């Protein structure tokens, strides 16, 4: 069971030249498939932007049009699988990793770039993405430490691809996300140190969190 099993079943049954993916709670625009087909005239795989369902002014549109290995190393800043399509022959060869519980889309996109396919992005919001009932911040805040280890598997799988610095950045951001809302902060910091190393932990905690927060406080106090 699970999304990746369902996607793989769809890929196995696909008979057309291109396969597109749609989660059951998201909604494509009327011309979504048309725009992807146009992009596929010059590409093997295509992504596109989205807007949040019920909040049409809140969009996620990445201006980058060519998706390279260096771009995807920084994470999936494009869309989920509801914004993705791919040539069927490539999808049948790659399939989705059913062992992963998160970052399945990023894992698939990484493997597309490793295939050196022509991978492009449509910098428009052409589908509606539905948020879950439980916010990500609430879910992460209440997550026990034991639950974070499975979330690191995609990064460990692609550790060589990421390289030392990007690997540390991805792991530290996953472990320390919403650290201000978590209990047992020292335990979370220790897990980050154990998994990502001192430098990555320092950068994520101090450089990207503590210092910007102090600067914002200083700015407010001087206004």
Residue ranges and their predicted role:
Residues 7, 28-33, 104, 108:
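Acidic donor-diphosphate engagement hotspot in glycosyltransferases and nucleotidyltransferases
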Residues 5, 33-90, 139-141, 165-166:
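Flexible acidic/His/Gly-enriched loops in nucleotide-sugar-dependent glycosyltransferase catalytic domains
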Residues 178-223:
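Membrane-interface aromatic/basic loop that binds lipid-linked glycans or pyrophosphate carriers
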Residues 66-146:
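Conserved nucleotide-sugar donor-binding catalytic segment
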Residues 1-14:
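Glycine-rich, basic loop-to-helix element that forms the pyrophosphate-binding segment
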Residues 19:
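Short aromatic/hydrophobic "clamp" motif used to bind/position activated sugar donors
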Residues 23-27:
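The conserved acidic donor/metal-binding loop of glycosyltransferases
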């Amino acid at each position: 069971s699970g999304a990746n099993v369902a996607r793989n079943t769809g890929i196995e049954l696909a008979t057309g030249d291109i396969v597109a993916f749609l989660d059951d709670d998201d909604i494509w625009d009327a011309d979504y498939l048309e725009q992807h087909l146009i992009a596929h005239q010059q590409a093997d795989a295509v992504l596109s932007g989205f807007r949040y369902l019920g909040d049409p002014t809140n969009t996620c549109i990445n201006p980058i049009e060519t998706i390279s290995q260096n771009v995807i190393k920084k994470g999936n800043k494009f869309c989920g699988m509801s914004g993705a399509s791919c040539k069927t022959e490539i999808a049948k060869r790659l399939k989705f990793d059913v062992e992963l519980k998160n970052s399945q889309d990023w894992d698939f996109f990484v493997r597309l770039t490793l295939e050196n396919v022509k991978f492009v992005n449509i910098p428009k919001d052409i589908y509606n993405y539905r948020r879950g009932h439980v916010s990500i911040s609430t879910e992460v805040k209440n997550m026990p430490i034991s639950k974070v280890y499975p979330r690191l598997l995609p990064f460990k799988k692609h550790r060589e691809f990421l390289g030392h610095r990007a690997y540390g950045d991805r792991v530290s951001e996953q472990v320390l996300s919403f650290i201000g809302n978590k209990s047992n902060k020292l335990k979370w910091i220790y897990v980050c140190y154990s998994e990502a190393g001192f430098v990555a932990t320092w950068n994520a905690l101090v450089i990207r969190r503590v210092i910007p927060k102090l600067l914002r406080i200083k700015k407010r106090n001087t206004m």
